């Protein structure tokens, strides 16, 4: 970031980091946003999705799908509000489509090709507007 100029820098936390380490997530989000702006770029939060409903990963995490989605949504939106940043809310779109389209890879955590396409479309829309 220091050696090149960027228009935007996309910030994505580990899948459950905004929930399991919320204070650290918010603190580091602020620091990163400051550094990004110092270099003339705009930070953008890439808000991720809950683990696949009914999947083993979600079961072992100890939350239901709605709860994980809500906590991720709240953490990412709080970080975006506090830091006055753009947000590419991919997690919200995954949630809206959860009972209509399979967006997950076999691990129930990462996106499949369709999920990746939707994520790319949302990010592009945020950056273009």
Region locations from a protein language model:
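Alpha-helical cap/lid subdomain in secreted, periplasmic
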Residues: 1-113, 117
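Extended, basic/helix-rich recognition subdomains
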Residues: 111-129
């Amino acid at each position: 970031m220091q050696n090149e100029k960027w228009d935007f820098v996309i910030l994505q936390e580990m899948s459950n980091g905004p929930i399991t380490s919320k204070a650290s997530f918010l603190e580091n989000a602020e620091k990163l946003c400051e550094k990004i702006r110092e270099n003339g770029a705009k930070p953008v939060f890439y808000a991720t999705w809950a683990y696949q409903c009914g999947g083993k990963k979600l079961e072992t995490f100890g939350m239901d799908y709605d709860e994980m989605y809500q906590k991720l949504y709240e953490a990412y939106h709080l970080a975006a509000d506090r830091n006055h940043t753009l947000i590419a809310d991919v997690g919200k779109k995954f949630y809206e489509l959860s009972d209509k389209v399979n967006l997950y890879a076999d691990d129930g955590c990462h996106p499949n090709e369709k999920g990746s396409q939707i994520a790319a479309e949302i990010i592009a829309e945020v950056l273009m507007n």
